[in-house]
Amino acid sequence: MFIQVIEGKAKDPEALHRQLEIWERDLMPGAVGYLGSTGGCTSTGDCILVARFESPEAAQRNSDRPEQTRWWQETEQFFEGPVRFHDSVDVQVMAHGDLDEAHFVQVMEGHVTDRDRAATLERESDPILSEVRPDLLGAVTAYFDDREFTELAYFTSEEAAREGERREVPGDAAKQMAEWQEVMKVEKYLDIKDPWLVKA
């Protein structure tokens, strides 16, 4: 899997959402290898779009389409200031349910201190989380060459996610979560309360 993360400050979040709807209607049918996307904006206008493709080549073919170029030229005017792009083929997916059914998405960004250990912890915690956090539908994590990462956690609802955060975690799970926090140094959270989810 290949992931492209696009981030920036929105002048008009609703206009960005409309542009995504236009892409879904008019451009998605011709996007061969497209697997879906997640997007949205925080209450302060920080926006993120995360597109998933089968491969970097599929993403590049989509990017090379003239209609894609025109669409992006129209879309970027709704951002304020520079837009950041981050690409990765180092992607880890954890799914306990249908991610596209999420009503709340929390984005975590930061630096990973030990990539291999992070992968092991995620695999080990998967069955535990599926039991102790039924509100968590799953997560998608993209690791980048500069040791940065972007993780998207998909929840049934914000209310359920907050309740899950307050719930006491069993000993083994608590130990793993503490180690995860040491390995995955989160520096930024984005709470997407109205996620834009596009199915392929």
Regions found by a protein language model. Name each.
Residues 1-50, 54-200:
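Short S/T/G/P-rich N-terminal loop/turn motif that feeds into the first structured element of a domain
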